[in-house]
Amino acid sequence: MLAETPLLETTLERELATLAVGRRYGKVVEVVGTMLKVAGVQVSLGEVCELRQRDGTLLQRAEVVGFSRDLALLAPFGELIGLSRETRVIGLGRPLAVPVGPALLGRVLDGLGEPSDGQGAIACDTWVPIQAQAPDPMRRRLIEHPMPTGVRIVDGLMTLGEGQRMGIFAAAGVGKSTLMGMFARGTQCDVNVIVLIGERGREVREFIELILGADGLARSVVVCATSDRSSIERAKAAYVGTAIAEYFRDRGLRVLLMMDSLTRFARAQREIGLAAGEPPTRRGFPPSVFAELPRLLERAGMGESGSITAFYTVLAEDDTGSDPIAEEVRGILDGHLILSREIAAKNQYPAIDVLASLSRVMSQIVPYDHSQAAGRLRRLLAKYNEVETLVQVGEYRQGSDAVADEAIDRIDAIRDFLSQPTDQLSAYENTLELLTSVTDDA
C-alpha cells in the first residue's frame, strides 16, 4: 500500500490541477494548420492557456492570438502531437512572462524564456510580462555620447551613439554573425542581450563558443529559437529578449541588444497572422506584421536612467526596394549598416559598404574634427569608385582630377583602415588617430 502512495499523490495532484475553482475549461473543436480553434473558454487576447489531458497531465501551453465568432484561436508553443478532442484548455488569466535578475547573466534561454543550457532553473524571483509599452518619448534622455564598439569602420565613419538603434542589412553569408560577435566583445556596455531567431541549430553553439567566447558570454544573456521551433516561439523570442534588456536598462545599466534577425521574426509573425485568417498584403505579409515592428523596435533606446543600444539584422533580398520588411525597418531605426557581397568577395572584412551606410545621430555626438575627417574619407572613397575602372585599364591620366589623384594615392591606406581582423578590436582613441592620419590634408 505504501508503495502506491507516490502514484496516488501524483494522480490526485493532476486531478486537483483540473479542478481549480472558478476556471472554465475549453475544448478543442478544430485544428487548422498550426492553429487551434477552441470553444467554451473565457480568455482574452494574448492570454496564455494550458493544454491538458483529462487526467490533468500538462501537454503544452498556447497563446490566444484571435477570435472567430464564438471560438478562440490559439497558437501552441510546441508540436501538436498528442492533442485530441479530449484535450482541456485552461486560461491562466495572464500573458507570457519571463524571469529577470542578475542570475540571467551567462545563461542561454529558449524563445519562451525557459533555460536551455542544461544548468538548471534560473534563480530569479522577479517576473515581467514580455509585452510592454515603449518609453514615453518626452521622458527619454537624448542620445549625447558615443558608444565605442571596437570595430574601426563603425567607430570612425558611422559612429554609434549610446541608446541608438542600428540595422544591419545583408544577404546570407557576408559576415553578419561575425560582426555581431565583434560588437558583443568590443562594445563598452554593462550587459549584452543576444537574440537568435530562426537560426540553424548547428550555428547556435558555434556562435556562443567560437564567436562570442567565454568572456563575452559571462556578461551576456542569450535567447535562442532555432528554425525548427514553432512560429509562436520564434516570434516571442524577440519580445523575451527585449523584456530582459528593459529590465537591466531600468536599473541604470548600459545594455547592448543584438537581434538576428528581424526578417525571421517577421516571417514567424506572418505564419501566425495567416493561420489566424488575416489577409495577405505586401509580399504576403499581413497587416499585423507592420504594426508589430514599430511596437517592438521603439522599446529599445534611451530610458530615464539606463539605455538599450540595439543592432537588428535584416536579410536583404535585393537592392531594388521591393523587400517590404527591409524598407519598413530602415524607416524606423536610427541608422543602417549595409554589408556588401562584392566587398566580401574582395576579402575585406567587415564587409560594410561605407557609402551606403549611415548613422543618423553621428553628427550630434562627435566633435567637428571627427565629423570632417569622416566626410573626407567618404569623399575620397566615392571619387576612387568613380575612376577605379579607368585606373585598372590604364586609361586614367594623372592630373586630370585633383581629388581623384588624392584618392588614388591614399586608397591603400583607406582600405587598411576599413579592414580589421575579426579577433582584433580597436580602441576608440586609436581609431580616431588613424582616421586623422589617413585623411590629413585630404
Curated annotation (Swiss-Prot):
The gene is sctN. It catalyses: ATP + H2O + cellular proteinSide 1 = ADP + phosphate + cellular proteinSide 2. ATP binds at residues 173-178. This is Type 3 secretion system ATPase. Belongs to the ATPase alpha/beta chains family. T3SS ATPase subfamily. ATPase component of the type III secretion system (T3SS), also called injectisome, which is used to inject bacterial effector proteins into eukaryotic host cells. Acts as a molecular motor to provide the energy that is required for the export of proteins. Required for type III secretion apparatus (T3SA) formation, proper protein secretion, host cell invasion and virulence. May play a critical role in T3SS substrate recognition, disassembly of the effector/chaperone complex and unfolding of the effector in an ATP-dependent manner prior to secretion. It comes from Xanthomonas euvesicatoria. SMART domains: AAA. It comes from the Bacteria. Its EC number is 7.4.2.8. The lineage of its organism: Bacteria, Pseudomonadati, Pseudomonadota, Gammaproteobacteria, Lysobacterales.
